[in-house]
Every structure is written in C-alpha cells, then in structure tokens.
Amino acid sequence: MKQVDGEKLLARLGPGVDALRGRLTPDAPMDRVTWFQAGGLAELMFQPHDRDDLVTFLKLLPDDVPLTVVGVGSNLLVRDGGIPGVVIRLSAKGFGGLELEGENRIRAGAICPDKHIAAMAMDNNIGGFAFYYGIPGSIGGALRMNAGANGGETAERVIEVEAVDRQGNLHVLSKADMGYGYRHSSAPEGLIFISGLFEGFSQEKSAIRAEMDAVRQHRETVQPVKEKTGGSTFKNPEGHSAWELIDEVGGRGLMIGGAQMSSLHCNFMINVGHATAYDLEYLGETIRGQVFEQSGIKLQWEIKRLGLFMPGSEVKPFMGVTSE
C-alpha cells in the first residue's frame, strides 16, 4: 500500500518547475538509492543540476512540505512506508567536485566520495586524509556526522562548510559553527551542505600510500565490504566497543527475516536476501534490547533511519525489553 503521492505533490509546486534543470521524480524508489537496497518510496525526489538550480527549487517549495536530504545512501535506512514530502539527492555532476584551494587545502563537493578526497590528497602530497579511504559514503554525510575511522575524523580536517538553508540562502560555517562531537554535528538540521574546505599537511606520497594501503587492507579484512550494508550500525559507547557488546549477547550472525548482524563484524547489519526495512530495524532494535538487558548500556544508532512505518508494522525501541 502506497503511503505517499508524488504526482499530487508535484502539482502543488506549480509552473515554476519548468525552469528547473535537474530531475524531478514522483514516487521514487529509495531501495535503488540506499546501500541496504531496502525501503519505500520518496514522495518526490529532486536531483538539482547545480547550486543555482537547488536554490531555485527551494524558493518554489511550500513551507509546509517536509524536506529530506540524502547523499549516496551509505548509512541510511528508509522505512517501508516511504518518505513524505521532498527528498533532495545532490547530483555528482553538480556537487561532486574536487579542487585544490591554497597550500594543503582541498575543497570537496558534498556528493564527492570520501575515498576520492583521500586519493587526491595523496596525489598532491597532502597528509591527514588517509582515514577517509576506509569510510563509505560521501563528504556531505561526513560533514554532518563527523565521520571518522582508523584514528582520524572529519573535525580534524575541516576548515569551513558551505550550506544552503530551506529558503535558498547561502551560509558559510566555520568548524566552531559545526559544533562537532563524536559522530555528531550540532549544525542546524535544516541546512543542506554543498561543499567543505579541508586542510591537511605536507607529507611524502610514499608514506601516504602506505597508510592508505593499511586502511584498505584492514577494512577488507574485518568488514563485510561486499555485502549490502550501511556501515557501522551503532556508535561506540564511551569506554566500550559496540561490536564487543553485541558479541557478548550472542548477536554475531543473528538473523531476522532477510536481515543479519554480520558474522565477520557484528556491528555491521547486512541485507542477506530480500530484507525489508522492517526486518533491518527490527533486528537492530532487538540487538539494542539484548545489550541493554545484559549491560544497562543503550546503544545509539549510527545508521540514520527515515520515513514512515507501514501500517501495523511499527518497530518499537529496544525490542523485547519490558521496561527501560
């Protein structure tokens, strides 16, 4: 049963859409966007051609229409009922650029894959970016969640962030404005990040290459990189590793429907067949419940979950726990 109506929403935008150069798709299947390959429809998806096109669209959008922004879908779970309102998915052509900007500085578009900035830095003898080689996803998501791996994180490298607000106004945020913490930014949720300026340090290419090779080898050895996964499912609680807590409750390899906690790395949830978003979220909340009952620790999702549940299929937090 469809919970959204994209054609009706498109009609509300009026004739101004004829001036747009990007792509408008009513009832867009989100399972084609997310790495989990599961989930419902976006009521209306817009892929802007460039920044000006994005601004034009935002000025057409009625204030009461919900707005969601997605990147490459690497750490995203869209519920089976879909996402009401507009989903903006930035295009690689308009928002995927990479360029040097001053000594040891790189500007990256929001949809630029994380590993591309690592490669460009290496090619130009700029150190400090090798950790990005082990992070799936794009720069926009890294800026939003302070993505990190292998001892590095986004907050260490970012200088400023370009963003557009709901009304189409451009903003430039400093690192302090971003309010970074562990896998978190306190920047306003309504801002659409369009690029970031990063700074590294001079380093020999051979040393950078060795570091990137180590990152790649580690990731391929301990993570299910060839599976349909969204990356790390839960954040590491202070003083603990999420995977160890999951392992202690027997969560490694646990399956619900077509969803499984990976046997290779049990903080990675994978779609092993035709899992629904319900299967995946139910599994995650079951794990949270088991960990809480044993240790009293409430694992926090690192995977972003969006959209509506199907009627009668709502997933409750901490499944199986009678009281918190």
Curated annotation (Swiss-Prot):
What InterPro entries does its record include?
Answer: FAD-bd_PCMH, FAD-bd_PCMH-like_sf, FAD-bd_PCMH_sub1, FAD-bd_PCMH_sub2, MurB, MurB_C, MurB_C_sf, Oxid_FAD_bind_N
In which broad location class does this protein mainly occur, judging by the first location in its UniProt entry?
A: cytoplasm
Name one matching Pfam family: FAD_binding_4
Q: Indicate where this protein resides in the cell.
A: Cytoplasm
Task: Please name the GO terms of the biological process aspect recorded for this protein, alphabetically.
Answer: cell division; cell wall organization; peptidoglycan biosynthetic process; regulation of cell shape
Q: Pathway membership of this protein? A: Cell wall biogenesis; peptidoglycan biosynthesis
Record GO terms (molecular function): FAD binding; UDP-N-acetylmuramate dehydrogenase activity
Catalytic positions are: R183, S232, E302
Question: What protein does this entry describe?
Answer: UDP-N-acetylenolpyruvoylglucosamine reductase
Q: Which organism is it from?
A: Allorhizobium ampelinum (strain ATCC BAA-846 / DSM 112012 / S4)
Its ancestry begins with: Bacteria, Pseudomonadati, Pseudomonadota, Alphaproteobacteria, Hyphomicrobiales
Instruction: Provide the gene name from the record.
Output: murB
